[in-house]
Amino acid sequence: MGKEKTHVNVVVIGHVDSGKSTTTGHLIYKCGGIDKRTIEEFEKEAAELGKGSFKYAWVLDKLKAERERGITIDIALWKFETPKYNVTVIDAPGHRDFIKNMITGTSQADCAILIIAGGTGEFEAGISKDGQTREHALLAFTLGFRQLIVAINKMDTTKWSQDRYNEIVKEVSGFIKKIGFNPKSVPFVPISGWHGDNMLDESTNMPWFKGWNKETKAGSKTGKTLLEAIDAIEPPVRPSDKPLRLPLQDVYKIGGIGTVPVGRVETGTIKAGMVVNFAPAAVTTEVKSVEMHHETLTEGLPGDNVGFNVKNVSVKDIRRGNVCSDSKNDPAKESASFTAQVIILNHPGQISAGYAPVLDCHTAHIACKFSELIEKIDRRSGKKMEDSPKFVKSGDSAIVKMVPSKPMCVEAYTDYPPLGRFAVRDMRQTVAVGVIKAVEKVDKAGKVTKAAAKASKK
């Protein structure tokens, strides 16, 4: 087995019919953690339902259905391997809450794979003003992604046309450049997620494709397939030396064990014996044990999805959206208010002070009021255009002061990136995205459990 491969997380984005499920399903199917027996069961079931031809997407549909029913499915099913990496697919899209998940979840992703349908009319629909392709790519950039792979899918439906491919590459390079990506650092790969061309093996149908190349500070890399492009992702730097921040996804009550909060370590490390604080709940207690995938860990590191057992804390005291931190090392606090730079993506009217939509920031989902519009700025240059604007509308970018309607814990993006970016949701869509510049924190005395008091004396 040798040394374990580095883990990387990818998110797959693109228009609804671009073939994301088929492409992702194909990778998971061919290089993934699904055992042969499960695959055979899937195939049999798909055939019985007359979905024989649909097996890759079907794999994903099965997994997704289980995930949505709340069955904690074996996360190995969402993994596949490249020569260098263990890859986890963070979100298989097509999910209603995909954009919300992107904001709350992609703090996790190291790279975005943008799937584009090459078919006539399909590409145009995806990239049109209201197509999802642009919105997803803009979100990815705003959320701090700098690594992008573009796969131009369904090349079989274009009769493997080089002209069509070149036309799409030119158009996509243009719009991702406008957003802020450097197209030179982005590999473009023509694929058929369905037939498997250029997925794992070089296609014989596109002899004209001489391969992708990407240039980054680390040097230039080339390859032929999507798998190679994923293998060429720059290895992520995990922020384990920062103080602990762990937003809770759920809190379980487990018989014989007690209260078990679950979440992903975003920064720092968590280990047994640590005295942790939950904000904004203001509860302090000792961590009894930390585990991942039912195995005890000596410490949870950034990127790990862990469950940890805490003493003398009831399930009613803490909840999803709370943030766990080390009580002795820059503990997290409740946020009274914060200033943020927001980009208005799509709002039918005008937004003025007093607007109070729901914010999704890490795992918190709380209404926040735009209490003051401080200044309007040019989205591309970041320069100030106007002080105290009366309103902002779609396409504008502004610095605003926000006040949460209920206790909430957020951080400045520069200190803790995953806790410093958010989506503004209203009318079932993402109205704006934002990055937090500064936070006004609340100091409040909270509940310190007996276990914490005892552990602190040690």
Curated annotation (Swiss-Prot):
| Occurrences of domain tr-type G (ranges) | 5-240
Q: By its UniProt entry, which InterPro entries does this protein fall under?
A: EFTu-like_2, G_TR_CS, GTP-eEF1A_C, P-loop_NTPase, T_Tr_GTP-bd_dom, TRAFAC_GTPase_members, Transl_B-barrel_sf, Transl_elong_EF1A/Init_IF2_C
| Pfam families noted in UniProt | GTP-eEF1A_C, GTP_EFTU, GTP_EFTU_D2
Q: Please state which protein family the record places this protein in.
A: Belongs to the TRAFAC class translation factor GTPase superfamily. Classic translation factor GTPase family. EF-Tu/EF-1A subfamily.
Q: Native species of this protein? A: Mucor circinelloides f. lusitanicus (Mucor racemosus var. lusitanicus)
What Gene3D superfamilies would the database entry show? P-loop containing nucleotide triphosphate hydrolases, Translation factors
| Residue numbers spanned by region G4 | 153-156
Localization recorded for this chain is: Cytoplasm
Residue ranges of region G5?
192-194
Describe its function.
This protein promotes the GTP-dependent binding of aminoacyl-tRNA to the A-site of ribosomes during protein biosynthesis.
**Binding, GTP:** 14-21, 91-95, 153-156
Gene that specifies this protein:
TEF-1
Q: Which residues carry this modification: N,N,N-trimethylglycine?
A: 2
- PANTHER family in the cross-refs: TRANSLATION FACTOR
N6,N6,N6-trimethyllysine: residues bearing it: 79
UniProt key word GTP-binding: yes
For this record, the Gene Ontology CC terms, alphabetical, are: cytoplasm
Q: Which domain of life is it from?
A: Eukaryota
HAMAP family for the chain:
EF_Tu_A
Residues with the modification N6-methyllysine, per the entry, are 3, 30, 316, 390
Question: Which residue intervals make up region (G3)?
Answer: 91-94
Q: Give the region (G2) as residue ranges.
A: 70-74
* Protein's UniProt name: Elongation factor 1-alpha
Region listing for G1, in residue ranges: 14-21
